[in-house]
């Protein structure tokens, strides 16, 4: 029996969305849907970004509105 849990660590700017720093670009819908599906299958998804403070909150809120949550 394997206890392996896949972990996806994804960057925000230029990966989950087009790079428009300090704003937020268009979503990478294909990747976001892939991560949502993997998470429903038990994978862990981590946001790996250099955004901090209000810019980090904006990024997390943006992802949540698109249905992507993080572990």
Positions of PLM-derived features:
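Alpha-helical substrate-recognition element adjacent to the catalytic core
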Residues: 2-71
């Amino acid at each position: 029996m394997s206890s392996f849990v896949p972990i996806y660590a994804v960057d925000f700017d230029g990966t989950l969305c087009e790079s428009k720093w300090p704003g937020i670009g268009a979503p990478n819908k294909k990747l976001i849907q892939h991560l949502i599906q993997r998470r429903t299958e038990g994978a862990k998804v981590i946001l790996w970004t250099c955004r901090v403070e209000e810019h980090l909150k904006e990024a997390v809120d943006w992802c949540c509105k698109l249905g992507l949550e993080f572990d």
